[in-house]
Amino acid sequence: MLYENIKKLVEYGIQTGLTPECEKIYTTNLLLELFQEDSYEDVEIDSSSIELEAVLEGLLDEAVKRGIIEDSIGFRDLFDTKIMNCLVPRPAQVQKTFAEKYEESPEAATEYFYKLSQDSNYIRRYRVKKDMKWKVDSPYGKIDITINLSKPEKDPKAIAAARNAKNTAYPKCLLCMENEGYAGRLDHPARENHRIIPIEIAGGKWGFQYSPYVYLSLIHI
């Protein structure tokens, strides 16, 4: 199953445009290294309908089985982010593509970046679908009510491990530029698959990014 899921994930990367076809072998080898696997067999897969959630679930179960990670949501989220980073273009390439798309139109650039943020699993679409949203009337007009279920609660193992972890002030905050590519900790989300677009506003240097939790449609920071 490991070889099958690795091949499916690489194919997912190619289909979504995260991974160029010419990097298929390179990406496969990156994934094999994560699983401490020295060999590989090119197995047959059905590439017509690859479900990212199912593929990642299978890979995470394999990582638990091999003793690479503990079986808790905290460790699984850290590791599947590391897995996805094997598919995602480096920041310079993302910035270059964004700039090229911007020459076409700002809409083309932001649509590209939002799609990448979803395809890379930075925005976890299968969790966002679980969010509950509805509208209610009020004296001031309609109010949007949202119950965010896409941000998972920490399990007891993660809480205990975080309590014993070494304190650090890096990154400075959850939205700071230092998060791009950060491996994460049990008390700080992994952002290895995260990309930020540098922009200049009124002479100041800023970073454009989307929220991974989609409190509102296309919410960005």
Predicted regions mapped to residue ranges:
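Structured core elements
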Residues: D144, G207-Q209
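Short, flexible loop/turn elements at secondary-structure junctions
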Residues: L149-K151, Y210-V214
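Short, well-ordered loop/turn elements at secondary-structure boundaries
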Residues: P139-Y140, I201-G204, Y215-L216
